[in-house]
Amino acid sequence: MSTTYLLGLAVALAMDAFAVAIAVGIGLKRIRFRQAFRLSYHFGLFQALMPIIGWALGTGIRQFTQSYAHWIAFTLLALVGANMIREALSDDEEEPGEKDPTRGLRLIILSLATSIDALAVGLSLSMLEVSIWYPALIIGLVAGAFTLFGMLLGQRIAKLQRFSSYAEVLGGIILWAIGLNILYDNGVFSPFL
């Protein structure tokens, strides 16, 4: 596998992580180093591990992955996005960091949602009979870098907004849009168009 092809693949896989990181950056009032590190690290780690898992599983779940992966990714993103919107519109006062998507279950869900495509790539690479270790490393590093850049870009976008109180709502809407785009890319809406 050529380095150019591998970098192109890594960038393509990092796009979901990048878009979700923008949404997270918009939703956070202020990005701390720990938050940026946690999100970048976890997105990169999951992006690196999923191709390895897919490669190890080989063809055993190939049909499932191709048929249902887009629904799983959409559901995870829609749940987190809906929760972000609900919390932004609620009047409940919460402790700082309680809504932090770079912690706990939210972090795991977002990491899974942005890396499901990498599982399918791992399955594909197993059929090409190539070593998975170098591609997984590159995919993880690129995803981590794009995540960091996306968070910083999202923070800049949030600062430009006139009504920053709606930043988290915008972040939730972006997650929904990403999820719907995943369904669109997989032809779910084609019978209706």
Curated annotation (Swiss-Prot):
InterPro entries: Mntp/YtaF, Put_MntP. Keywords: Cell inner membrane, Cell membrane, Ion transport, Manganese, Membrane, Transmembrane, Transmembrane helix, Transport. GO terms for cellular component: plasma membrane. The chain crosses the membrane at residues 6-26, 41-61, 65-85, 107-127, 132-152, 169-189. It holds the Pfam family Mntp. It is found in: Cell inner membrane. One of its GO terms (molecular function) is manganese ion transmembrane transporter activity. It comes from the Bacteria. It is a multi-pass membrane protein. PANTHER family: MANGANESE EFFLUX PUMP MNTP-RELATED. Probably functions as a manganese efflux pump. Belongs to the MntP (TC 9.B.29) family. This is Putative manganese efflux pump MntP. The lineage of its organism: Bacteria, Pseudomonadati, Thermodesulfobacteriota, Desulfobulbia, Desulfobulbales. The gene is mntP.
